[in-house]
Amino acid sequence: MDSNSKYVYASKKRKYTCDDEEAEEHNDPHDKNIYIINNHLYFSSDITPKSAFTLCKYLRSLEIKLRVESISASSNVQPEIYLHITTNGGCIYSAFSIIDCFKSLSIPVNTIIDSNVSSAGTIISIHGHKRYICTNSYVLVHELRSGCWGKLAYIDDTYKNCLKIQAHINQIYLDKTKITKKYLKEILVKDLELNADECIRLGIADEIYISK
């Protein structure tokens, strides 16, 4: 999990900057990595403030669409969203915003680990109402990474902030999975990927995904 002096990150292999200074085209480049088919939403992107904003926008739009369809059909069946996640991770603050979006919706979001989900992506996936993993998918859980520069006092404050955020992340894993404190401490300092069977055993996922 990575951070710089402005944002804190949880990513598989890369450090990112979170400043939005790069020139962008008019169309949101993240839209092509996030799309909807029926009640399935596919997210294949690094987790950034922009991709998180786009994903939350799509989730809210899909919620409205599904509720309208349910009312129109006079259906007593609770509509559900299936979120397929493929990501190397990214900004942990952005991951938190997606979790809060889940909680604000009136219909459940089921998460599907598709191919690979790492770091901040796992924080999202374990918050699904039902949590699935594809047979050949892998998950990476590891600790925060950070880098900063400046005055000693600023560096000290950044370190304290990172400790606070890491404690927050640790508690999420302990609350949402079957991972023990001892084992969490072991895997956070490593970069060892977990397969589908291990994820189910550890409570990171509930079951193998079968196409809905």
Residue ranges of predicted features:
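Terminal-region recognition feature
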Residues: 1-212
